């Protein structure tokens, strides 16, 4: 069972990619060093980047963010003023005629996240734009 307060952990999860990891593969220095040196590690292989730090943050499990957002909505413990619109709603637009197979082909995971952000922006009075549609 997950805690209803797991949203802050999701927000701080990408911070792990911002800090260097201690490199412990080198032997201890005879002069008195600890043998640990700060360097940026490649998360996939565990080796330092030869050119320095990566220029982009990495989200380790982007699908887990969507699943957790759906669980928070399903639990009914969303705070006042913070509600996500998961899935398409019938508002009379031309996009409601898409079949489920076509929607997955066109949207995918990133398309679904973009729709959620656009829906939240529209509710708050922000502008909206469409990717490659009309």
UniProtKB/Swiss-Prot annotation:
Keywords: Amidation, Neuropeptide, Secreted, Signal. It is found in: Secreted. Its main location: secreted. The modification Phenylalanine amide is found at residue 131. The keyword Secreted applies. Expressed in the hypothalamus. InterPro entries: P518. Residues 1-18 form the signal peptide. GO terms for molecular function: neuropeptide hormone activity; orexigenic neuropeptide QRFP receptor binding. Belongs to the RFamide neuropeptide family. Stimulates feeding behavior, metabolic rate and locomotor activity and increases blood pressure. May have orexigenic activity. May promote aldosterone secretion by the adrenal gland. This is Orexigenic neuropeptide QRFP.
């Amino acid at each position: 069972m997950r805690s209803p307060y797991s949203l802050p952990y999701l927000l701080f999860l990408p911070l792990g990619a911002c800090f260097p990891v201690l490199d412990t593969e080198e032997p201890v220095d005879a002069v008195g060093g600890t043998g640990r040196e700060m360097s940026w590690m490649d998360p996939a292989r565990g080796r330092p980047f030869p050119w320095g730090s990566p220029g982009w943050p990495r989200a380790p499990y982007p699908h887990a963010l969507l699943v957790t957002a759906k669980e928070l909505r399903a639990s009914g413990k969303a705070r006042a003023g913070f509600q996500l619109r998961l899935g398409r709603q019938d508002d009379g637009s031309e996009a409601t005629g898409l079949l489920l197979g076509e929607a997955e082909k066109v949207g995918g995971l990133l398309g679904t996240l973009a729709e959620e952000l656009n829906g939240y922006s529209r509710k708050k009075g922000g502008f909206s734009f469409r990717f490659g549609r009309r």
